[in-house]
Every structure is written in structure tokens, then in C-alpha cells.
Amino acid sequence: MPNFSFVFFYDSAKITPISTALLGRRMNYLKIAQDSLSVESNALLQLSQRLGDDFNQVIDLILACEGRLVIGGIGKSGLIGKKMVATFASTGTPSFFLHPTEAFHGDLGMLKPIDIVMLISYSGETDDVNKLIPSLKNFGNKIIAVTSNKNSTLARHADYVLDITVEREVCPNNLAPTTSALVTLALGDALAVSLITARNFQPADFAKFHPGGSLGRRLLCKVKDQMQTRLPTILPTTNFTDCLTVMNEGRMGVALVMENEQLKGIITDGDIRRALTANGAGTLNKTAKDFMTSSPKTIHQDEFLSKAEDFMKAKKIHSLVVVNDENHVVGLVEFSS
């Protein structure tokens, strides 16, 4: 008896097993995926073309807000709302998610009258969402409706309306929030990016909210925190063979050419290759000053590591000499692309 693996599809209350061997011959999944992405990309284009002055008014409202941007939604709309909150909060717009059902049972106490409330409902008729409206009006909160139905209960009671209409969901049954979820997510990103630009939100600001992980290290860490202080140094008169020995022992692929505590140059793997190409066996008779790179690039020890890395990327170099206030060499920072 042959071995079959099965995929289960839910059809109402029934569970129907379908052999994956048969399934693979039935459909071209690539075509389905491409069609889905085509529909969704077109929906994003339509959203872009549909944006009007309401969008500008919402941005101005949020910029002037002295409270928080509170976002609420149910189901997929709620999940999208949580992602919006995460983006806003990390880019300079204080924000939190308010579950409409929980809000109706006590969490409304989290609100202040100066907060702005953004409610997401594609139909605009989600009962748990709309039940909040009288309380929000009573508190004095401004309401932003994110919906496809400008004549809905939510839209009619909101102060501002952002339209997320889509022609259809890519779900074959036109039921599961797919295209509409993407459009809502993209609208949230468009709002966040506009606010970032309006506030001139810089990497240093971003770093304050992302102190952990590689991102935080790059944005908050200073050069002096990561630089190597045990440096491979040679004199201008050091011969080629001894230079190679120092570079090998230093394990950095470079040697700093120093004289009287002053930086005269740097020798990298590239300098070694160029010297050998130009001089062949005669390179053995050369000294450091003959093939070093004079006036190497430097950076101050108190600069952010991100600046050092960006500089090395731009100059296409892998090592940068670190100096102090007196312009004395105190370290070396490396970058691996």
C-alpha cells in the first residue's frame, strides 16, 4: 500500500483530507500567488491616489496632540492596530492599543480627554467598536475612523475619516481580510512615516527607543566602546618581512606606522598586495614608508559607532584609526561588510 501524506482543509464543519501528491498536480500555486500580489499592489496604488486633505488633517491633529494616540479594533483590524501602535510608539508618537471589548468593561479608564482615538473597522459597523463612541464623545476625545464605508455609523460619528476601501479581498471567497488588512497596514505606515518626517525624527532619537540588540548597539554605542586598544604598530623603517609578522600577530589585517607617538600611515592587506604587484621580489627590500598609505582616515573616540560604520562603508575601507582630543591614536575600529 503506497504512503500518502495529507493536507486538511476546513469546509464548514467537515475536515476533508486531500493527498498532497494529488494536490500538487491540481493547481499552479505560483500563479495564485502572483495574482494575489498583483491585486494587493493595485489596491495600494489606489490607496495612494485616494489620499486627500483628510490625511493632512489627521497628521496635523496628531502632531498637535498633547496626549497619546490610542488605537482600537477587533479581530484582524485589532492585530493591524497593534502593529501600528508598535510603529508609532517606537518613532516618537506615544501610542497604545485599546481593545474595544475590554474598554467597555473598565479599560476606558486608561484614556485621558487629550488622547486621540483611532478606531479601525472595515465595515464601520463593528458593534464592539461603535459602542465606544458615546463614551469617547463624553470624554471629549477626537475620533479618527479607519473604514471603507463613509456612511457607516463609525464614520458618521468620527471627527476624521481615512478611507481603506478595496475592490475585493484576494481570499477566493472574498471574505478573509487580506487586501483590506494590507491596505490598513500600509496606511498606518504612511501615517508613521509622515510623522517621522514632520518631527525630523533622527537615528539618535530612534536609538532611545531601541537600546537592545544589534540596532541599539549600532545607534547608541560609541567608537571607544568597541575599538581595539592593543594595536599592531611598526616604524617607518620596519622592513617588509617584519611588517608582515606584526600584521599576522595583530590579527587585524593592518599595521599602524608610528613615529614619536605620531601616526605616519597605515598598512593594510591591500597595500601589501599592491606592493608585491608593483615590485615583485624587490618588495623584500622595501620598508614600511615605501608602501604605507599616508594620512590615514581617523575618527574621534566619542563619535557613535554608526557614524564610523557609515564612513567606512562610504570610503570602502575596513579599519579606521581612533583618536582622542589631542589627536593621539588610542585605538582601531573594524567593520565587516
Swiss-Prot record:
Catalytic activity as recorded in UniProt: D-arabinose 5-phosphate = D-ribulose 5-phosphate
Residues given in the record as Zn(2+) binding sites: H99
All residue ranges annotated as the SIS domain in the record: 58-201
SUPFAM superfamilies in UniProt: SIS domain (SSF53697)
Tagged with keyword DNA-binding: no
Transmembrane segments: none
Position of the signal peptide: none
Listed Pfam families: CBS, SIS
E.C. designation(s): 5.3.1.13
Keywords tagged on the record: Carbohydrate metabolism, CBS domain, Isomerase, Metal-binding, Repeat, Zinc
Residue ranges that the Swiss-Prot or TrEMBL entry lists as coiled coil: none
GO biological process terms held by the UniProt record: carbohydrate derivative metabolic process; carbohydrate metabolic process
Residues the record lists as binding substrate: 92-93, 99, 105, 131-140, 165-167, 237, 290
Ranges for domain CBS: 227-284, 292-337
Site (Catalytically relevant): K76, D128, E169, H210
GO molecular function annotations of the record: arabinose-5-phosphate isomerase activity; carbohydrate derivative binding; metal ion binding
Top enzyme category: isomerase
Family that this chain belongs to: Belongs to the SIS family. GutQ/KpsF subfamily.
Function (record text): Catalyzes the reversible aldol-ketol isomerization between D-ribulose 5-phosphate (Ru5P) and D-arabinose 5-phosphate (A5P).
Protein name per its UniProtKB record: Probable arabinose 5-phosphate isomerase
Protein species of origin: Haemophilus influenzae (strain ATCC 51907 / DSM 11121 / KW20 / Rd)
